[in-house]
């Protein structure tokens, strides 16, 4: 959805100006690309850096940079749960904030060392390259606030993709009370 949104923002009609292959299992798109399917591919990490490292292609752009800040990861809870357990929501939010503070104040190498055990299948140099790329793209926000601008962008993308029938009011779904 984000890729097609970016194409449309740049005057490219995904339906008529190019062919997007969407019938390849998500887990093997990198292999299909390296094997000769397609001229470009959209990949998450560590696959994008893996293609580059193995000489199968180059990372030429980041959807996150070109789209604007899209809140890929959001955490949800029922209003009743938040009312009954505000201390849990606040503690969880503080934990996420500590992580953001860490990644925004430490080197790519330091971060890669800390997260390496979670990515046993990815060698250290690749992991460090990925973290460096995320740093250079400002992937990690400074805070946990889900802004109204990001919410509107997300709805624009969903609406453009045809999966959102009716827009929702920001205040009806988002609270920043635990982020302040």
Task: Go through each PLM region and give its residues.
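Secondary-structure end/capping motifs
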Residues: 83-163
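C-terminal solvent-exposed extensions
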Residues: 153-180
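Pocket-lining segment of extracytoplasmic ligand-binding domains
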Residues: 25-117
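Structured loop/turn residues at beta-strand edges in well-structured enzyme cores
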Residues: 16, 36, 168
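Residue-level marker of alpha-helix boundaries and capping positions
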Residues: 19-20, 38-39, 145
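Short glycine-/small-residue-rich flexible loop motifs, especially phosphate/cofactor-binding loops
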Residues: 4, 12, 30, 48, ...
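Ligand-binding cleft/hinge of the Venus flytrap
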Residues: 1-18, 22, 52-55
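Residue-level detector of short coil/turn "hinge" positions at structural boundaries
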Residues: 14, 58, 165-166
